Amino acid sequence: MTQVYDGFVHLGFSNRNGRTISHKKYQEGNSRVSADNSDANGVPYYFLINMGGGFVEGEQYQVTIDVNKDAHALVTTQTPTYVYKCEKGQLTQQNTSITLEENSYLEYMADEVIPYLKSRYFQTSRIDMDKSAHLIYSDGVTAGWSHEDLPFQYHYFRNLTQIYQDNELVYSDQTLLEPEKQDMFKLGYFEGWRNYNSLVMVSPNIDEAFVKALQKHLEGLNLESDFAISSLDISGLVLRILGKTAEDNRRIIYSCADYFRQEIHGLTPLNLRKNDMRR
């Protein structure tokens, strides 16, 4: 590693005799990882932890995850990502790099970003995956935090997520929010809501029939958020959610992940041991 980061995590997973093990766990700076053994299916389950409680102005973080052939791992954040104010105008950054080999399966369930007053934040995620691999990837952003509890007091938020299959760019999604320049409540932005989340699922098992069945499944739930599902040009889908609370949005995300787990892989529902989980 040539660049110096304020926090760095590298996780690697391999299949050994039909069982996934963590063959690499590296952590430095403000970043830590913690294992949890609560998954009933025996899937390695890790929390990403920031020891400082949040990201300080100008800090840079890196998360690298490698999932080898036939391995399955679950990675989530312990808490939302708090981005503190940037009084000097410096950009705070986090980069995530994910590699998925043949028939591997990663569930990356990140909590939303909560930008503080005057904060500036840029997040990039690059996923390189084999066409036979399976991916569940979620993230989000809120209206932020300020002492006066006023929404959208941050200066700059940018989130770029790109997925490559066999070195070809197949999905690119960018969220750019500059509340001082944009009306965050109008159509196409938050539309009166305070929380936005997205979920991307890519798998050779996802087709139009699966997408329609998932849509019907979600419509049968008592949900308080607005959501929409779209099929991708590849075998996959993207779910976008606007809601009053992050907890309401996460309920939809977990429901989608559970549906995929059960219908495609025959696994039990997620148990992320989060305080807002409502089963």
UniProtKB/Swiss-Prot annotation:
Superkingdom, taxonomy of origin: Bacteria
GO CC term (a single one): cytoplasm
Job of this protein: Required for maturation of urease via the functional incorporation of the urease nickel metallocenter.
One of the record's GO molecular function terms: nickel cation binding
SS bond partners: none
Keyword Chaperone: yes
Assembly notes: UreD, UreF and UreG form a complex that acts as a GTP-hydrolysis-dependent molecular chaperone, activating the urease apoprotein by helping to assemble the nickel containing metallocenter of UreC. The UreE protein probably delivers the nickel.
Protein name: Urease accessory protein UreD
Family under the similarity heading: Belongs to the UreD family.
InterPro entries in alphabetical order: UreD
Keywords, sorted A to Z: Chaperone, Cytoplasm, Nickel insertion
